[in-house]
């Protein structure tokens, strides 16, 4: 990369949202749903310019006539044709750039299957003809964004949650814990408990309304039992929400019962450790000498960590699990919704990083396997 003027592109593909923009920027230019929609029925009116597929916000707005699919499930790409459509949309419609003119930094889930990162590499070089590319692990990028190289990242998005211990910039694969419980499950759970209150939300369109209720009104209780008692004895915790049709609904203990399932997955009928235990368990899988550094640098990342009260609750829960003298610090940066992208933006604009790119030439010489040697 002799020409320093070329800005790298940074694309963070999440299960729920795709974040994209230019390296060196402090926030992504484009944030849109990772959805591809196809018409349910053949168009009646000929020449209406009906496309065979829609991506992102356009798919979302036409969701009434489309079947919506998420090509990324639980953080991992499962449908490559649709994924290609999302990347195409990202470059040409959202960022309006020619991918053959810019290096591209992509992100991947921790423990992403090897074949997947090879496929990503192949599509970038062969379909989009990028001059150079790199694949970064999401949690590691979040840690960089917080200005650290050692710590444990609790990254929780729409499709999956990971506890990832990182030492001197390297994720420790043997200690990474994955939890298939994230934003989408919480939205579904809120739909369920609102139904018990007598409000019915069933369709995919209504699910988006519930997601908005979740994002605007939910919070994490410091003491769940005590909060339940408060909610039962007074209406101080109740909030109202106006639906698109003007109807107003009231929501009470659902506000904190919904995110409580992050700490008590049994609420969702799941037999697994909550986010506090998985974080503690991941720390315990690490070498005894580095645990102190992990406890003192526990970084929250991703949209599902945006609930008010979550950092205080994590602090309380981990303090009760850890040795009594241990110093525990939970770091919750305000921009953590986008910290993976921000970390990618920082990394791709470092002068020391420029020799890390996989170039088209290296790819042509070595094939997709090069990604395992250069990105770790």
From Swiss-Prot:
EC number(s) on file: 3.6.4.-
SUPFAM superfamilies cross-referenced by the UniProt entry: Actin-like ATPase domain (SSF53067)
Keyword Nucleotide-binding on entry: yes
UniProt keywords, alphabetically: ATP-binding, Cytoplasm, Cytoskeleton, Hydrolase, Nucleotide-binding
Subcellular location(s) of the protein: Cytoplasm, Cytoskeleton
A single cellular component GO annotation: cytoskeleton
InterPro entries attached to this UniProt entry: Actin, Actin/actin-like_CS, Actin_CS, ATPase_NBD
SMART domains: ACTIN (SM00268)
Domain of life: Eukaryota
Catalytic activity: ATP + H2O = ADP + phosphate + H(+)
GO molecular function: ATP binding; hydrolase activity
Protein function: Actins are highly conserved proteins that are involved in various types of cell motility and are ubiquitously expressed in all eukaryotic cells.
Protein family (similarity comment): Belongs to the actin family.
Record-linked PANTHER family: ACTIN
Full protein name: Actin
Organism in which the protein naturally occurs: Taenia solium
Gene name of the record: ACT1
């Amino acid at each position: 990369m002799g020409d320093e003027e070329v800005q790298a592109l940074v694309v963070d593909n999440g299960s729920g949202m795709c974040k994209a923009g230019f390296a060196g920027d402090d926030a992504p230019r484009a944030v849109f749903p990772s959805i591809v929609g196809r018409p349910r029925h053949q168009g009646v009116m000929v020449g209406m310019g009906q496309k065979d597929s829609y991506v992102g916000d356009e798919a979302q707005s036409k969701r009434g006539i489309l079947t919506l699919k998420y090509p990324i499930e639980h953080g991992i790409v499962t449908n490559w044709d649709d994924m290609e459509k999302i990347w195409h949309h990202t470059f040409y419609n959202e960022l309006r750039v020619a991918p053959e003119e810019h290096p591209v930094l992509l992100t991947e889930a921790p423990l992403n299957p090897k074949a997947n990162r090879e496929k990503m590499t192949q599509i970038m070089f062969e379909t989009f003809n990028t001059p150079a590319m790199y694949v970064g692990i999401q949690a590691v990028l979040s840690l960089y964004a917080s200005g650290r190289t050692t710590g444990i990242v609790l990254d929780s998005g729409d499709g999956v949650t990971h506890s990832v211990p990182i030492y001197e910039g390297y994720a420790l694969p043997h200690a990474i814990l994955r939890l298939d419980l994230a934003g989408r499950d919480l939205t579904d759970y809120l739909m369920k408990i609102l139904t018990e209150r007598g409000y019915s939300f069933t369709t995919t369109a209504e699910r988006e309304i519930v997601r908005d209720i979740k994002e605007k009104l939910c919070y994490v209780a410091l003491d769940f039992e005590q909060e339940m008692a408060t909610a039962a004895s007074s209406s101080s915790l109740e909030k109202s929400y106006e639906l698109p049709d003007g109807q107003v609904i009231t929501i009470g203990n659902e506000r904190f019962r919904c995110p409580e399932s992050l700490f008590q997955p049994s609420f969702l009928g799941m037999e697994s450790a909550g986010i506090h235990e998985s974080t503690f368990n991941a720390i315990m899988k690490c070498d005894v000498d580095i645990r102190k550094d992990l406890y003192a640098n526990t970084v929250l990342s991703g949209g599902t960590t945006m609930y008010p009260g979550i950092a205080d609750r994590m602090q309380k829960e981990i303090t009760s699990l850890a040795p009594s003298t241990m110093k525990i610090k939970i770091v919750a940066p305000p921009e953590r919704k986008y910290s993976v992208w921000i970390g990618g933006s920082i990394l791709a604009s470092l002068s020391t990083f420029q020799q890390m790119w996989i170039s088209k030439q290296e790819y042509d010489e070595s094939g997709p396997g090069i990604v395992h040697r250069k990105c770790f």
